[in-house]
C-alpha cells in the first residue's frame, strides 16, 4: 500500500498545486461570478486535469532516478553490467524502439520502466532481482519492461490519469459550489466563492483523487497482461517469463515509488489499489495467450 499511496499523492499534489495557483489568479471567482459556468468549468478541469498528468509524465524519469537512487550504466564496469546493457539493447531492437537508459538500483526483487517517450525511456532492475534469478529469467523481466515501453504504457496511463483528474476537478467544484451556496443561503452581501467552497474543493480533490486511483489501477492491471505477453513474444517463447513470474511469487517483492508503480514487475497488496494482477493470474493468462 505504501507504493500506491505515493503514486496517488504525487498526482494529487500536482493537481492541487495547479488548482491553488488557479485560485490565486482568481479563476474560481470568474467561474462563479454569475452562477456556476459549467462550460468554463469543464475547460478549466481539462487544463488542470491533463496538465497534472502531463507534468507527472514529463518528470517521471528524473523522479524515478531520484526516488530509487538508480545508478545509470553509462559504461559497464563488469561482465554482468555489460550483459544487462546488451540484453536491453537486443530486446529494444526487437521491439523497434530506441535504446533506453539502463540502470541498477539497490533493493529487493523488482524492475521498472519509465519515461515520457518510447525512444528515450529508462529501464532499471534491482540488485535483488539480479541476485535471485537466472539470466534467462532476468531477460524475461527486462523484456516485460521493454514491452511496457513499446506498448506506450507510460503515455496511455498518463492519458487515463488525465481523464480521471478532469473528472475529479469538475465534480469537486460542482459539489463545492452547491455546498457553499447552501451554507451562505440568504447572505446577499457576499459575492464569489466563500470559505465553504474552498475547503470543500480541497477535501473532494483528495477524496475523489483516491477513488480515481482505483480506476487507474484497474487499467494498469490489464496492461500488465499485455506486457507479460509482449515479453514472451520478444523472446519467442513463454517459459522464461512464466519462470520469472513463478520465482517472483516465492520472493518478497521490492517497493517502488507510487509514481512508477504501474511500470514495475511486482505488484502491491491491496486488491483495489494494486497496479498488478496476482502472480497466478498472470501465469495462467500467459499460458493461454497466443505466442
Swiss-Prot record:
Enzyme class: hydrolase
Classification via InterPro entries: HtpX_protease, Pept_M48_protease_HtpX, Peptidase_M48
Membrane topology, from the record: Multi-pass membrane protein
Co-factor binding comment: Binds 1 zinc ion per subunit.
Transmembrane segments: 4-24, 39-59, 159-179, 199-219
Cofactor: Zn(2+)
Stretches assigned to coiled coil: none
Nuclease found in the keyword field: no
One biological process term in Gene Ontology: proteolysis
Compartments, record wording: Cell inner membrane
EC number(s) recorded for this UniProt protein: 3.4.24.-
Metal-binding among keywords: yes
A molecular-function term among this protein's GO annotations: metalloendopeptidase activity
GO terms under cellular component: plasma membrane
Positions with a binding annotation for Zn(2+): 144, 148, 224
Active-site residues, Swiss-Prot/TrEMBL: 145
Keywords annotated in UniProt: Cell inner membrane, Cell membrane, Hydrolase, Membrane, Metal-binding, Metalloprotease, Protease, Transmembrane, Transmembrane helix, Zinc
PANTHER family assigned to the protein according to its UniProt record, in alphabetical order: PROTEASE HTPX (PTHR43221:SF1)
Family: Belongs to the peptidase M48B family.
The name this protein goes by in its record: Protease HtpX homolog
Source species: Albidiferax ferrireducens (strain ATCC BAA-621 / DSM 15236 / T118) (Rhodoferax ferrireducens)
Amino acid at each position: 500500500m505504501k507504493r500506491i499511496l505515493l503514486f496517488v499523492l504525487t498526482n494529487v499534489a500536482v493537481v492541487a498545486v495547479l488548482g491553488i495557483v488557479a485560485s490565486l489568479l482568481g479563476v474560481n471567482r470568474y467561474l462563479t461570478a454569475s452562477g456556476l459556468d459549467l462550460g468554463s468549468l469543464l475547460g478549466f478541469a481539462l487544463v488542470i486535469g491533463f496538465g497534472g498528468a502531463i507534468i507527472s509524465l514529463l518528470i517521471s524519469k528524473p523522479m524515478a532516478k531520484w526516488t530509487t537512487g538508480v545508478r545509470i550504466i553509462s559504461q559497464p564496469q563488469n561482465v554482468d553490467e555489460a550483459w544487462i546493457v546488451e540484453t536491453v539493447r537486443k530486446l529494444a531492437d526487437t521491439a523497434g524502439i530506441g535504446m533506453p537508459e539502463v540502470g541498477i538500483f539497490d533493493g529487493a526483487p523488482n524492475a521498472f520502466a519509465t519515461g515520457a517517450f518510447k525512444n528515450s525511456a529508462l529501464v532499471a532492475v534491482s540488485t535483488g532481482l539480479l541476485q535471485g534469478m537466472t539470466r534467462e529469467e532476468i531477460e524475461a523481466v527486462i523484456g516485460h519492461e521493454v514491452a511496457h515501453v513499446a506498448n506506450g504504457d507510460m503515455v496511455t496511463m498518463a492519458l487515463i490519469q488525465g481523464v480521471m483528474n478532469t473528472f475529479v476537478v469538475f465534480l469537486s467544484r460542482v459539489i463545492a459550489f452547491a455546498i457553499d451556496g447552501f451554507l451562505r443561503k440568504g447572505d446577499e452581501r457576499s459575492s464569489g466563492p466563500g470559505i465553504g467552497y474552498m475547503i470543500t474543493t480541497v477535501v473532494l480533490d483528495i477524496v475523489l483523487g483516491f477513488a480515481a486511483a482505483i480506476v487507474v489501477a484497474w487499467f494498469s492491471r490489464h496492461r500488465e497482461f499485455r506486457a507479460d505477453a509482449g515479453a514472451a513474444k520478444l523472446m519467442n517463447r513463454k517459459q522464461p517469463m512464466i519462470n520469472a513470474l513463478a520465482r517472483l511469487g516465492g520472493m518478497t517483492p521490492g517497493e517502488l515509488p507510487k509514481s512508477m508503480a504501474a511500470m514495475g514487475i511486482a505488484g502491491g497488496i491491496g486488491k483495489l489499489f494494486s497496479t498488478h494482477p496476482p502472480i497466478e493470474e498472470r501465469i495462467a493468462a500467459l499460458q493461454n495467450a497466443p505466442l
